[in-house]
């Protein structure tokens, strides 16, 4: 996949901007931010952590779209095309459920897009996180996660990075915005993630799962 940082046409840039401005409307479906005391109050395309994937997908559809990018199998990732949910905001939706859970309870849900220019991802990441900071500035029990860049352990060459910022709830769950910048050593497009994660899944991510 190309990692070229070439100029994106004006129309593509405007589309990219509209997608991520609309992200905030999609995620935050509460009447007021002051009611946002539980990570389960937030949704992506009408779905959230704690829901069963079976409410939205058949078991066959789930099994047909399982991914394999964790080095252990505590959680199972599933990628579904955004168009399946009639999404105009995300190219893919990622779910994570616990291995062996026949109810397919969602522990993490993300909306994904694949920016052609990683710098556009960084710009939109800052805008979204600034909006979130303002929206929840007076809400107790929420801690800001400043933007930081890390090496992505999926790339053993050490050339790939992910940049993350977000909000951490006192219950341990988190809302994060990530830009994944993959090197040519990794057969993957660059990614922008908007994620809702439970405390348990956040702990899993911090355990170097790749």
Question: What kind of region is each of these model predictions?
Answer:
Residues 1-16:
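Short, Lys/Arg-enriched N-terminal segments with co-localized hydrophobic residues
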Residues 81-105:
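Compositionally biased P/S/T/G-rich terminal and signal peptide-adjacent segments
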Residues 15-18, 193:
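Position-driven detector of the extreme protein N-terminus
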């Amino acid at each position: 996949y190309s990692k070229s940082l070439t100029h994106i046409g004006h129309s593509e840039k405007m589309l990219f901007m509209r997608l991520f401005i609309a992200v905030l409307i999609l995620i935050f479906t509460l009447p007021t931010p002051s009611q946002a005391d539980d990570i389960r109050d937030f949704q992506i395309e009408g779905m959230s952590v704690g829901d069963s994937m079976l409410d939205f997908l058949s078991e066959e559809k789930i099994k047909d779209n399982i991914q394999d990018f964790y080095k252990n199998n505590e959680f199972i990732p599933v990628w579904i095309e955004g168009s399946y949910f009639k999404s105009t905001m995300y190219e893919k939706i990622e779910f994570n459920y616990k291995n062996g859970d026949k109810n397919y309870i969602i522990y993490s849900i993300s909306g994904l897009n694949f920016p052609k220019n990683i710098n556009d991802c960084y710009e939109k990441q800052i805008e979204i996180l600034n909006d979130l900071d303002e929206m929840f500035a007076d809400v107790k029990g929420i801690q800001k996660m400043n933007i930081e860049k890390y090496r992505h352990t999926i790339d053993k060459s050490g050339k790939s990075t992910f940049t993350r910022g977000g909000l951490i709830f006192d219950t341990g769950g988190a809302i994060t915005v990530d830009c994944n910048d993959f090197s040519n050593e990794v057969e993957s497009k660059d990614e922008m993630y908007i994620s809702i994660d439970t405390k348990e899944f956040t702990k899993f991510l911090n355990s170097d799962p790749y």
